[in-house]
């Protein structure tokens, strides 16, 4: 198929069909499966090829104390899709955890990873995994690693962006696309955020920065604060997203405020045929933190002072685990104009496997420029790459 059609909003439809305020939507998979199945069925009839299981908020923390296990909820959700939409692919839908990761919050990267891994393990019998509405690149990475390391399913990764073109934590579509492509995602997308016209330029930026299929799931405009209704008609929604389809977006559906009627209108227009001229993917050497990207197409100044070679003070700081000193050196170099910082903690008596990832986290909590991880120890590099937020450069590794 030239296009795959996703479903629309589950929350909007549950509210329209009588879900009481304060209800945890995922519990309805067990307490009112007929209601959930009615939504799935209507999206399938409207033309959806892929239907999302009602698991967006299903995670160990949110379901704690409900009396239902994570596996029970997720398996019921998948069963509801299978029964109501047997001809559609079933996506395990994974949303944010609802907690900020370090350094913005208290949840560690590995703690986030373990929570996502539990969700993936509970839903491995879905046809694919969708990680969506993510606002933090670091949390998105934790979710994608969990999906890839705990299943063999294809993974669609979708972030949400604000009016300034950055995510809540400051990531751009370019950084998102380059990082998630490098981590092995199978499809990239943007969802929620705003209406389709707002998403089009952001989607074009994603298209230019990945060779992967790109997905769009916009809102039906903006909500009315008086009654919660959304501003766009189905015809205007389709008209608004059409330029993205013409530019190369091939996976499309709707988020907040969209209904089966929206998907039906979208399916009808796609069925008439769309002339597509995909924005070309720009191959380039690119490194980034979560906030700042550097295209390596010319000479770039790299700060080399985060290296213990012939630096007794730096060696002592490593032995003392004096990360404040490392951070001060990083800050001085960025203020002097370094575009990338080389980081090496290899010295006699130093456990690089432990120290390098910790140094990465400490420095990235303060400095925005990308890092170049410098080590001849593959295990240390692997540990550091795992916790790095963005797409780093790697230096000195032996083949």
Predicted regions and their residues:
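Domain-level signal for soluble alpha/beta catalytic cores
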Residues: 1-399
